């Protein structure tokens, strides 16, 4: 063996021998700030013995002498105790409540003329700000521990996302994916400590920002939130695709204790809003002039949230010589607008927003707005045959004329019947008066019946 190697090995052995005896077999206990830790002290005999707990400065913390146990004058006086029920089993643990990071250090249990050392390491997980934060804000989580400690740290976020193994975790511009429970696992000397921190990102949930509608149909706007216990005020402002150059307010509202109350709203729109979460708006009719972009603003105590929403309206118009389909409002260039007759090939728009067919054939036509084969909007219109289309006005006039003639004839018949009854009644009245004036009446039964029959 090389003499230099032998000397190196001998030097290492001497270093190990010279280490303080108290450090050998030292028990390590990990604790969380604010909770309690139990430091073990086990005697070889399963019976109650005298014992004493001290810190590394030999200050007495807690012990038993004779039949009494008492606490020392340490800074832990109000936060320490022991489990008396375990003393008969030869166990004399030191329980420290409401742990603080400065409580970290070496504690010594003296029992049976021997010293048992326990190293306590207290850690705390702190956040740079409130863990309820707005979308886009930043947050840093920091693991605090005793100076000189170098534990293994592992961070894990929602969806088991793993992060760096440093003592701090930075989350710049938090998003919806960061909302949830974050776990910090601390490992030291085969001991493990787990911290959980729940982060709530106040934001709108992910929903489609564009609503598609056919002209005249009812439209619903929904704005689900990631929270429901914040009081706020809100406003939906709208910029029409063809109209004013500046946005105008459509509706204002407030949310207090989960109840929604409407402030001001445009009367001509006849907007309806749900009285509870999620935020829900109903537009009775989607008209072409309403197509455009809107912005919903929520005012919270922590700041503002914004959500953009677009309304795309499809309109189909027909004339004697053409059929036109168009969409109004903001659309993506990748969308395809097509017009086709059933069971025939499509006629695709070159402008993405308008397609026209001249001299459309009779039958059912479809106008489609699609995105990579997925139909977003569909409108159908029926084109009548040319002969029927030209004859339809005349046929309608004939039908209306016939109905009018029947009504006039019925009125004439009713009037004639009333006149005949009136004339008949007048003749009978005149005949009775004439008979009475000539005194041709009598009291015999057959004459009386005749007179009565005349009346």
Curated annotation (Swiss-Prot):
Q: Provide one Gene Ontology biological process annotation.
A: cell adhesion
Q: Where is the lipid attached (S-palmitoyl cysteine)?
A: 419
Gene Ontology CC annotations of this record? cell surface; plasma membrane
Q: Which residues are glycosylated?
A: 46, 220, 231, 295, 299, 343
The Ig-like C2-type domain extends over 126-203, 204-314, 315-371
Query: For the modification Phosphoserine, which residues carry it?
Result: 430, 437, 453
**Where found?**
Cell membrane
Q: List, alphabetically, the InterPro entries matched.
A: CD4 (IPR000973), CD4-extracel (IPR015274), Ig-like_dom (IPR007110), Ig-like_dom_sf (IPR036179), Ig-like_fold (IPR013783), Ig_C2-set (IPR008424), Ig_sub (IPR003599), Ig_V-set (IPR013106)
Signal peptide, first to last residue: 1-25
Family annotation (Gene3D superfamilies): Immunoglobulins, transmembrane domain of human cd4
**Gene Ontology molecular function, alphabetical:** coreceptor activity; MHC class II protein complex binding
Outline the segment boundaries, as ranges, of region: Disordered: 145-165
Question: Domain Ig-like V-type, which positions?
Answer: 26-125
Q: Which residues lie on this side of the membrane: Cytoplasmic?
A: 416-455
**Chief location of this protein?**
membrane
Tell me the domain of life. Eukaryota
Pfam families assigned? C2-set, CD4-extracel, ig, Tcell_CD4_C
* UniProt free text on domains: The Ig-like V-type domain mediates the interaction with MHCII.
**What does the annotation say about its assembly with partners?**
Forms disulfide-linked homodimers at the cell surface. Interacts with LCK. Interacts with PTK2/FAK1. Binds to P4HB/PDI. Interacts with IL16; this interaction induces a CD4-dependent signaling in lymphocytes. Interacts (via Ig-like V-type domain) with MHCII alpha chain (via alpha-2 domain) and beta chain (via beta-2 domain); this interaction increases the affinity of TCR for peptide-MHCII. CD4 oligomerization via Ig-like C2-type 2 and 3 domains appears to be required for stable binding to MHCII and adhesion between T cells and APCs.
What's the name of the protein?
T-cell surface glycoprotein CD4
Read off the lineage from the record: Eukaryota, Metazoa, Chordata, Craniata, Vertebrata
Q: Which gene encodes it?
A: CD4
């Amino acid at each position: 063996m090389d003499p230099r190697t032998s000397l190196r090995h001998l030097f290492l052995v001497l270093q190990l021998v010279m280490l303080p005896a108290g450090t050998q077999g030292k028990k390590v206990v990990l604790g969380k700030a604010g909770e309690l830790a139990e430091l073990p002290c086990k005697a070889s005999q399963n019976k109650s013995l005298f014992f004493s707990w001290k810190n590394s400065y030999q200050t007495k913390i807690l012990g038993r002498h004779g039949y009494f146990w008492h606490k020392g004058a340490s800074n832990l006086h109000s936060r320490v105790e022991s489990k008396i029920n375990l003393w008969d089993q030869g166990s004399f643990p030191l329980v420290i409540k409401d742990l603080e990071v400065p409580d970290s250090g070496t504690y010594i249990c003296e029992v049976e003329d021997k010293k048992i050392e326990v190293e306590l390491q207290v850690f705390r997980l702190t956040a740079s700000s409130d863990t309820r934060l707005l979308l886009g804000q930043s947050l840093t989580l920091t693991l605090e521990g005793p100076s000189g400690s170098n534990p293994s740290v592992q961070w894990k976020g929602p969806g088991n996302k793993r992060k760096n193994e440093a003592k701090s975790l930075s989350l710049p511009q938090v998003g919806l994916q960061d909302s949830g429970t974050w776990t910090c696992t601390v490992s030291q000397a085969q001991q493990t400590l787990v911290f959980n921190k729940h982060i709530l990102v106040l934001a709108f949930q992910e929903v489609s920002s564009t609503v598609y509608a056919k002209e005249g149909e009812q439209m619903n706007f929904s704005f689900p939130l990631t929270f429901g216990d914040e009081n706020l005020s809100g406003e939906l402002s709208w910029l029409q695709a063809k109209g004013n150059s500046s946005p105008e307010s459509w509706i204002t509202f407030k949310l207090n204790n989960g109840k929604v109350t409407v402030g001001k709203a445009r009367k001509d729109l006849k907007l309806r809003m749900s009285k509870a979460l999620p935020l829900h708006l109903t537009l009775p009719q989607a008209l072409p002039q309403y197509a455009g972009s809107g912005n919903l603003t929520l005012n919270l105590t922590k700041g503002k949230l914004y959500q953009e929403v677009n309304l795309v309206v499809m309109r189909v118009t027909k004339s004697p010589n053409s059929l036109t389909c168009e969409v109004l409002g903001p659309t993506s260039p990748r969308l395809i607008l097509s017009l086709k007759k059933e069971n025939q090939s499509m006629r695709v728009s070159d402008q993405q927003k308008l397609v026209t067919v001249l001299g459309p054939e009779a039958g059912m036509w479809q106008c489609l707005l699609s995105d990579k084969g997925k139909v977003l909007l569909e409108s159908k219109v029926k084109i009548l045959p040319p002969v029927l289309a030209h004859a339809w006005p005349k046929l309608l006039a004939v039908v209306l004329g016939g109905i009018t003639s029947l009504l006039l004839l019925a009125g004439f018949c009713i009037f004639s019947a009333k006149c005949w009854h009136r004339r008949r009644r007048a003749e009978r009245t005149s005949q009775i008066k004439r008979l009475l004036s000539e005194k041709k009446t009598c009291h015999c039964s057959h004459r009386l019946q005749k007179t009565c029959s005349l009346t």
